Amino acid sequence: MQRSAGILLPISSLPSPYGIGCFSQEAYDFVDWLKEAGQTYCQILPLGVTSYGDSPYQSFSAFAGNPYFISLDALVEEGVLTAAECKKANFGRKADDIDYSRLYTERGRLLRLAYSRSDIGHNEAFTAFCEKNKWWLDDFALFMAVKDRFEGKPWIEWAEDIRLRWQPAMDYYRRELYFEVEYHKYLQFKFDEQWRKLKAYANSKGIQIIGDIPIYVALDSADAWANPGLFQLDKDNIPTAVAGVPPDGFSPTGQLWGNPLYRWEAHRATGYQWWITRLWYCFELYDVVRIDHFRGFDEYFSIPYGSETAVDGHWEKGPGIELFRAVEQALGKREIIAEDLGYMSETVRQLVRDSGFPGMKVLEFAFDSRDTGSASDYLPHNYPVNSVAYTGTHDNETLVSWYQTISDAERAMVRDYLYDYATPDEQLYKSMIALILRSAAATCIIPMQDWLGLDNAARINKPSTVGQNWRWRLKKTQLTKKLQKEICQLTTRYGRKNWA
């Protein structure tokens, strides 16, 4: 990665009149805004179909896209919806919030209406899409249709015949739920069509997309249902152990994620084909891919299934560099960012070095005594060129609120490091942004909320909590020319401007 800069903003957080950010005109406008701000990258969160809890890191599929992101305006232009129908829908009254319960009802109703008016049976592009993607699409669409039939229950609670994918049951549900299966294929077709168009536009403006994928798939996913042999499941397809992380300064009982763990010996036996295919598909969608929880490839935390916390977990060895050598042999060199935050053993550090991928540096961790990593690694003067620097990520407090909540001693450390005792507290975030922009890190990614100087009301996610996460949205009025000019000036000053 060349010396550059970018902004972190989930698609869901874009402005939109339809309850959630999507592939609408506002997304294209944001691309234009980024270009004028001198940026090279737009980093987003995973684009997968979200489930209960609304986390993009717990998706029903590692390959399917979120129908919430389909532009309704584009469907109006196609003639399968009317502007009046879209305007009549109630997506909630707050322009800076996502009301997922209303979204589920209203968008679902409109998308089904669009499907009922579409002529996909005679659409050659739809047929070609289904044929090209049948290797994941057939299982996913059937999974979603059967899930609806079983009133949304996780697949491990379905009837035994379809839970274990007995052929007579598979054939029966494909016939019985044919139109429902086609509906889910239609949604994926529209998602793919609209996303590729938006990405092509971004690339034409010199903006590259940094995508994000979780290392694990969700237990309640088409991936686990269709490929039980690749995961640590018993003969009844029930997990024997699940993923998480041990206790640390942020979470005294650790984090119990609940994802099924990989059966790495099964992946090794196939030459890691599932992972090669997954990453190949990611690079069809993104220019750069950030892999969350990269340390899990060196060693992963295994928690007995049924545990209420992560305290009884233990570390086990992962595939290590062998996996990424197989990926490189199959796909060539690709741009991957290794999320290597938190406590890193020497073997994890060695894996990151051996891979050649840039790791991540988060400014907030440099001054926060709760962090279990080495704080000095996160001080900007120590950032290596082969790294991506952030003020914070989607899991962190906004820079403004973080500075307010750390201790007096930690705030003094920040002031001393900046050698700035005059700037008012409420404006100090700008000095901290400038601090990482002038570091040696090849790329700097700043969350949009930090450029805006927003507090935790704009925080994306607080790990180990549910209810108020993944909801913040940007208001269109916040994308001002003044802010754009300020970002461009700082980006240019520190040699990061995109001149494309």
Stretches with model-predicted labels:
Residues P10, S16, D54-D192, V217-I445, ...:
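Alpha-amylase-like alpha-glycosidases and glucanotransferases acting on alpha-linked glucans and related
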Residues Q25-T50, L285-Y286:
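Catalytic domains of carbohydrate-active enzymes, especially glycoside hydrolases
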Residues K35, W195-N203, E328, V352-R353:
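Surface-exposed amphipathic alpha-helices with a cationic face
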Residues E36, I162, A169, W472, ...:
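Domain-scale activation on soluble regions of proteins
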Residues M1-S12, Y28:
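N-terminal regions that are enriched for targeting/export leaders
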Residues H184, Q188-V217:
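Conserved, well-ordered alpha-helix/loop/beta-strand core segments that scaffold catalytic motifs
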Residues L45, Q208-I210, P214, V288, ...:
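Outer-envelope exported proteins of Gram-negative bacteria
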